[in-house]
Amino acid sequence: LICCASFEEVFAAVKQDSQTIGMLAIENTIAGSLLHNNELLRQSGTQIVGEYKLRISHSFVCLPDEDWDDITEVNSHPIALMQCREFLGQHPRIKVVEGEDTALSAEIIRKENLRGHAAICSKAAAERYGMKVLQEGIETNKHNFTRFLVVADPWQVDELSRHRNKEVNKASMVFTLPHTEGSLSQVLSILSFYRINLTKIQSLPIIGREWEYQFYVDI
């Protein structure tokens, strides 16, 4: 298992060793799409070989010998903080500070013995770093899921396919269109004609070309 500090590092690890399989978040039911990851994926030369949907549940954790009255600051990833806005609104005296990662926030508090600090992370991360769970399930929306993509070097796709338990029933594409009237509608009409279900469409601006876009679709 290779832990990466950024999504860029995930693709770098796959590029460095073609036997390495990468996993990265692409979409959350509350926060929406991670747009930057779409572009990283397009530039990487890797291929999507699967996906995994994970139920997200956040916990409020602190050092083992501290309690609610000791907490003055909470650290976590910006998206996790956003997903717990209702809970944080009930504790206005606690200062909210953004961090790089949910689990990393808990790890830093534990290793550096940051008294008065709490982290928002998973219960598994709390157990791993010996943190005390003050409250579980603090996310605002209990139907909180993140979709992860599994990516690999194109040379590994056939080998991985042999170990798949079911048929491939999903594909992702990226394309650009001429900046003319009805160009996107024509593409969607083709998908409709062949009874292909479009599950997602996302537009991103093309850097250096004003008001022109590329489209990412899942079918």
Language-model regions: role of each:
Residues L1-I219:
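Domain-level signature for soluble enzymes in the chorismate/prephenate branch of the shikimate pathway
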